[in-house]
From Swiss-Prot:
DUMP binds at R21, R172, R173, R214, S215, N216, D217, N225, H255, V256, Y257. NCBIfam families: PRK13821.1, thym_sym. Transmembrane segments: none annotated. This is Thymidylate synthase. Keywords: Cytoplasm, Methyltransferase, Nucleotide biosynthesis, Transferase. GO terms for cellular component: cytosol. HAMAP family: Thymidy_synth_bact (MF_00008). It comes from Pseudomonas putida (strain ATCC 47054 / DSM 6125 / CFBP 8728 / NCIMB 11950 / KT2440). Pathway: Pyrimidine metabolism; dTTP biosynthesis. Its main location: cytoplasm. Its EC number is 2.1.1.45. Gene3D superfamilies: Thymidylate synthase/dCMP hydroxymethylase domain. The lineage of its organism: Bacteria, Pseudomonadati, Pseudomonadota, Gammaproteobacteria, Pseudomonadales.
Amino acid sequence: MKQYLDLVRDVIDNGTLQGNRTGIRTISLPGAMLRFDLQKGFPAITTRKLAFKSAIGEMVGFLRGVKNAGEFRELGCKVWDQNANENAQWLANPFRQGHDDLGEIYGVQWRQWPGYKRIPLSNPAAIEMAEQAGFRRIAQDEEDGVAFVILYKAIDQVRQCLDTIANDPGSRRILFHGWNCAQLDEMALPPCHLLYQFHPNVETREISLTLYIRSNDLGLGTPFNLTEGAALLSLFGRLTGYTPRWFTYFIGDAHVYENHLDMLNEQLKREPLEAPKLVISDRVPAFAETGKYEPEWLEKIEPSDFWLEGYEHHAPMTAPMAV
C-alpha cells in the first residue's frame, strides 16, 4: 500500500490546516486518486493492523439497509456508535428516533431510495408507465389549476446495478449513490463514500469499480473505505461471473486530522508489506462455476464469508474518531 503512504505524505506536505464542524483541525488537500489492480492483491494497509472484520461488517450492514448502530454492532462493527449517540447535532435532530438510530444513511439510500413522480392527471400514459415500473399512487392534488398525482417507489439501486451487469454489461450507467439532497437532514452523517460506478468488460470478463468519496479521513476512513470498495467489487464479480480488476478511488477532500499526525507519521516510517489476497467463502455461489444468477446473496452475505489470506502487518495503532 505504498500508494496510500504516498498520499498521506502528499497531504501532510502540501495540504492546508483548516477548521471544520468537528472542532478538530485537519490538514486538507483537494483532489486525490488511488488506483489498484485487484489481480495483484487486496488493498489492505500493512503499516498497521487493518480492522478488516469491522469494515466488512459495515459493508454487510449497508447491503442490508441497516440504519441502527446496534445492528452494526451485531455485525462486528462499532464505528457508528458515536455518530448515533454522541453527535450533538444529531442528538438535537427531531428526525432521530431514539438510542442507536442513524436515520436514512448509506444503506437505506442504496437499497430503498425513496423515488417520487409528480405527473399531471392529463397524462394518463405517463401514469400508466410509472405504475408498470412499480410506482404506486399515494396522493393527488392541484396547483395553479393543474391536477396531478404523486406516485412512490422504493428503488433498490444496488440490485439494479447487479441486474444490469448480468443483463446489459455494455451499459455505462451502472452506478448507485447515497447523496439524497431531500434527506440529508435525516441522517446522522451524510455519505462520504457516495458514488459507486461499475465497469464490466465482456471481452476480458473483468469488472472494475470507480468510487468517488467527497470527504476522506486518511487516518481512519481511507483504510476502511478501500476495504469495503474492493470487497464489494469482488462480491459483484463473484455473483455475475466477472474477475475483479481495477479499483479506482477518487477523493474530493483528502485530509488528515491533527490528532492523527503521530499515528500517521509513525506509519510513514514503516515499510509496507506484501498485499494479501481476499477470499470469499465457498458458501457464496460463484456464477462462473454455477451459471446461475443469484442476486439474493446481496442480503444473505455474512461478515464471516470474507477473510484475508497471507495478511502480514506491523504493530496495531489507534487514533480517536472525530464526530
